[in-house]
Regions:
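Short, conserved sequence motifs used for protein processing/export or organelle targeting and
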Residues: 1-214
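C-terminal outer-membrane/trafficking sorting elements
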Residues: 220-227, 232-289
Length: 289
């Protein structure tokens, strides 16, 4: 939507099996944080604390998301099993139905395989056109998931930085909570609870990335713009054209008009690195015809 910040996140499974795999307590979740240039948090999905676990994760089970638009929505990759009544359970002997399974499949995974009924996706992931399908052709077997974070552009920031982290957690506290209710009646459970609560249960970082984004152009603005106007450490420089004008040639020059470097139009529109350029005032010369 016009005026929204929008980021597409793609995860690719590099393992030869579903991720996370093995015992169904294991989860992976995406932490997405949007900050202004001063480091102030503007949006945060998937934050984790020792006291609450994954903030925003639903009490029963979190839906599989294709688009996230609020902080109480978080993408959690997991398998959720249900008992004969359809209620989620952590007791394997009571498992009767598959409520959710959006764990990332390995590359080449096919729903047409003869054994698919034993390793099938949950219903929500199966309906996601971006889950295990390539962006170009829509063919399955990509071993990936693509999702969108859409955030209203009412944050009073022309430049933002997005931090995306994939976390892995082997045993969330809620998985063992029902077992701990029996600690007074079981010395073994009480002993395990003591060890569990004293252990470092910080999620493992699987992958992380950071990117900058800038407020889009106004179709009615007749002027070329650069974003940001003042470059901070590590920030790329982006050329924003008026309307749908496409540059043919882009040159970065210094205050004396000397050429610092030529930039391809594609790189100029996406944002290019200037970290190796000395501090000072610079201009961009653009040719459109």
């Amino acid at each position: 939507e016009m005026g929204d910040w929008e980021f597409e996140v793609e995860l690719r499974n590099l393992a030869g099996h579903k991720f996370p795999s093995g015992y169904p307590s294991r989860i992976a979740f995406i932490e997405f944080e949007l900050q202004d240039p001063d480091g102030n948090t503007l949006f945060h999905s998937g934050e984790w604390t020792p006291e609450t676990g994954v903030i925003g994760r639903d009490e029963t089970w979190e839906p599989h998301w294709e688009t996230i638009e609020s902080e109480d929505q978080v993408q959690v990759y997991e398998m959720v099993i249900g008992d004969v009544t359809g209620a989620p359970t952590q007791v394997l002997e009571r498992a009767s139905v598959l409520i959710k399974d959006n764990r990332l499949p390995p590359r080449g995974f096919s729903t047409n395989h003869a054994a698919y009924d034993t390793v099938q996706f949950g219903p929500m992931a199966a309906l996601d056109a971006n889950f295990n399908r390539t962006a170009q052709t829509g063919e399955e077997g990509s071993g990936s998931d693509r999702m969108t974070y859409r955030i209203p552009n009412d944050l009073n920031a022309a430049t933002v930085q997005a931090h995306v982290t994939l976390h892995y957690l082997s045993v969330p506290a809620r998985w063992v909570q029902s077992m701990f209710e029996w600690a007074e009646d079981s010395e073994e459970i009480a002993s395990f609870q003591s060890m569990f609560e004293s252990a470092d249960r910080t999620p493992v970082v699987v992958a992380t990335t950071t990117t900058w984004a800038y407020r889009g152009f106004d179709q009615n603005d007749p002027e070329w713009r650069l974003a940001p106007s003042a470059i901070g450490s590590g920030q790329p420089l982006r050329l924003i054209p008026p309307g749908e004008t496409i540059p043919l040639e882009v040159v970065l020059v210094d205050a004396l008009g000397r050429t610092v470097r030529s930039v391809t139009p594609d790189a100029a529109l996406r944002g290019f690195d200037v970290s190796d350029v000395a501090s000072g005032a610079f201009f961009v010369r653009v040719r459109t015809e």
